[in-house]
Amino acid sequence: MSKSIVFFSTVLVFLFSFSYATPGIATFYTSYTPCYRGTQEGVMIAAASDTLWDNGRVCGKMFTVKCSGPRNAVPHPCTGKSVKVKIVDHCPSGCASTLDLSREAFAQIANPVAGIINIDYFP
């Protein structure tokens, strides 16, 4: 009985956490210009668009990202998973997304063939 309550509570917390997420767009990239001048920050990383960049103040912040649907003709790109990424770069002006994820992070939440997806994200 107590395991059921813990499981149910965990599911509720997860569901409510995404109900407060911000919608956006994600793409992926492979060429990084790190905020940390060459310090490797792993593979679960992202570049922030001008919307989030805030003169670099977002560097080092963590965001949870989940695919919320397609943005092109690739059917059903979402895996149903979420990923936690660290902002380590700036997506330059004209960037087609809110968050430009590493290929590894993108592949956790969507089929890389899609290239661009709708997302929900929160800090």
From Swiss-Prot:
Isomerase is among the record's keywords: no
Residue ranges of domain Expansin-like EG45 in the record: 24-123
Major place of residence: secreted
InterPro entries: EGC1/2, Expansin/allergen_DPBB_dom, RlpA-like_DPBB, RlpA-like_sf
Keyword Secreted part of the UniProt annotation: yes
GO terms under biological process: cellular response to hypoxia; systemic acquired resistance
SUPFAM superfamilies: Barwin-like endoglucanases (SSF50685)
Signal peptide (residue range): 1-21
Keywords in alphabetical order: Secreted, Signal
Superkingdom as given in the UniProt entry: Eukaryota
Alphabetical list of Pfam families matching this protein: DPBB_1 (PF03330)
Annotated compartments: Secreted
GO CC term (a single one): apoplast
Alphabetical list of PANTHER family matching this protein: EG45-LIKE DOMAIN CONTAINING PROTEIN 1-RELATED
Function: Might have a systemic role in water and solute homeostasis.
Protein name stated in the entry: Putative EG45-like domain containing protein 1
Source organism per UniProt: Arabidopsis thaliana (Mouse-ear cress)
Gene name of the record: EGC1
